[in-house]
């Protein structure tokens, strides 16, 4: 089955590429689709990568309505939500057994709504992007 229409592609000088596909689906479906195409859901190590990803997603969105894009942000059933941490106890799920950064800059701790407090349920989060008043876009993680 062919992939959904690709909305945008952006590659870094270091060789990593991000692509956004517009489709309605669950976290598991998005992760599986990325795996089929030898990729993985995006993860962000710092502000430069975040700016790159936000630019790509802004290019992919159409209209002022908020859009939610699945990224590799997940909380295992054995981890607790932690309001003191930027990612609130969530961590980056990396395709192919790679490792994501453990230290996360505070600037990445922007949530549209605080995630549900839990120590027993696996949870997933995406990156929500919305048109901001006066131009530009607002963003935040959202369960």
Predicted regions, residues:
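Conserved hydrophobic ligand-interaction patch in extracellular adhesion modules
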Residues: 25-75
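Extracytoplasmic/secreted cell-surface and envelope-processing proteins
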Residues: 52-53, 79-82, 135-136
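Cys/His-rich zinc-coordinating "finger/knuckle" motifs
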Residues: 18, 24, 41, 87, ...
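Typically disulfide-stabilized, N-glycosylated extracellular/lumenal ectodomains of secreted
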Residues: 126-143
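Surface-exposed ligand-recognition segments of extracellular binding domains, strongest
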Residues: 64, 68-130
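Extracellular disulfide-stabilized recognition modules
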Residues: 1-39
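Beta-strand elements of modular eukaryotic interaction domains
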Residues: 6-10, 30-32, 59-62, 114-116, ...
């Amino acid at each position: 089955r062919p992939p959904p229409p690709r909305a945008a592609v952006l590659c870094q000088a270091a060789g990593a590429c991000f692509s956004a596909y517009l489709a309605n689906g669950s976290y598991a479906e998005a992760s599986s689709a990325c795996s089929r195409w030898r990729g993985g859901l995006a993860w962000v190590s710092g502000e430069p990568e975040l700016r790159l990803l936000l630019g790509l997603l802004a290019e992919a969105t159409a209209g002022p309505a908020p859009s939610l894009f699945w990224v590799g942000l997940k909380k295992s059933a054995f981890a607790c939500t932690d309001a003191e941490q930027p990612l609130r106890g969530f961590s980056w799920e990396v395709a192919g057994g790679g490792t994501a950064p453990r230290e996360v800059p505070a600037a990445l701790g922007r949530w549209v709504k605080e995630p549900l407090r839990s120590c027993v349920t696996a949870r997933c989060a995406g990156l929500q992007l919305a048109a901001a008043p006066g131009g530009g876009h607002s963003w935040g993680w959202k369960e």
